[in-house]
């Protein structure tokens, strides 16, 4: 997106945050279950599970919910989820990547395709837009860990590639392959991160006007409302004037 703060301001527009939060815990629980099933149910022995729990705690997910999600992975009748990535184009030729965890590929593909079509977009083949994104690691810290200079110094020492700081926190970017190593090094200097995850970062942003931005937001809302969808990434950019209207 066009920087962390701009996209957060858009997506946190009036009334939207509560709707997203109502589904957040179920999505976090699904990632915890998948992570626990993919390895050992012990976070000290399972890096993916450790990160999933860490990210859930950052969103104030209750411990009971976390424990229940881990136990669900051990159940003989538990669902098996597939990790699927969808790629397509939204209004204005914008590129969109959708990550999902699903127990029914046909259902999820149908729902995602329907969302794209209704918004005037089109679902493409795998690889049709991901080439214009970088798959990187992102580690976030609260402002309370220190100023930008302190975080930058720690990030460089840890082998990170970039740091962005705004009024909401510090965002550290590193190579996807080095995410675990960089996160561990940062933990020794800055303490436990708020979130540690892999993200798709657009190489270049596509400017869109207010009308197309509204259509894009409806598309993203529709995708995020799907229980199977875990993450949505895009490369659109709006002017400050349009941003103010969208965030009102």
From Swiss-Prot:
Q: Is the keyword Flavoprotein assigned to this protein?
A: no
| Sorted UniProt keywords | Cytoplasm, DNA-binding, Transcription, Transcription regulation
Give this protein's Gene Ontology molecular function annotations: DNA binding
Cross-referenced InterPro entries = Integrase-like_N, TACO1_YebC-like_2nd/3rd_dom, TACO1_YebC_N, Transcrip_reg_TACO1-like, Transcrip_reg_TACO1-like_dom3, YebC-like
Instruction: Kindly indicate whether the keyword Transcription regulation belongs to this entry.
Output: yes
**Gene3D superfamilies the UniProt entry points to:** 1.10.10.200, 3.30.70.980
Where found, per UniProt? Cytoplasm
Q: Which GO CC terms are listed, alphabetically? A: cytosol
Give the record's GO biological process terms: regulation of DNA-templated transcription
Please report any disulfide bonds recorded for this protein chain, giving both cysteine positions.
none
User: Record's family?
Assistant: Belongs to the TACO1 family.
Official protein name in the record: Probable transcriptional regulatory protein RL3983
Question: What is the native source organism of this protein?
Answer: Rhizobium johnstonii (strain DSM 114642 / LMG 32736 / 3841)
